[in-house]
Amino acid sequence: MKIVALTLVAFVALAGASCPYAAPAQAYSAPAAPSGYPAPPCPTNYLFSCQPNLAPAPCAQEAQAPAYGSAGAYTEQVPRYVGSPNREQVQQFHQRIGMAALMEELRGLGQGIQGQQY
């Protein structure tokens, strides 16, 4: 065990010695003027969902001063498809899970009885 530990320490020391020293990075300074890319043209955006229809989503308005580049062009809220369930929905879910487990258990018992010979 001591040999393994000694070998590991020697390997780590060798690996550390072979790596060049990296000087600490300089502090980041923000650019003087904001720069950005122009927003791509947006004729029609579609929000996709599980429903068969597509609903067009409007493009965001141009960014006002101070301009933040193209990041200001995409300010639409993220759609929320599923809200938090109420108590009745949670109870129905638990009942369905319980019934599914019961049906699976009864299926297993039925197959076990059919496979037995009397």
Curated annotation (Swiss-Prot):
It is found in: Secreted. It comes from the Eukaryota. The keyword Kinase does not apply. Residues 1-17 form the signal peptide. It holds the Pfam family Vitelline_membr. Transmembrane segments: none annotated. Residues 36-75 form the VM domain. GO terms for biological process: vitelline membrane formation involved in chorion-containing eggshell formation. Keywords: Secreted, Signal. One of its GO terms (cellular component) is extracellular space. GO terms for molecular function: structural constituent of vitelline membrane. Major early eggshell protein. Belongs to the vitelline membrane family. This is Vitelline membrane protein Vm32E. It comes from Drosophila sechellia (Fruit fly). The gene is Vm32E.
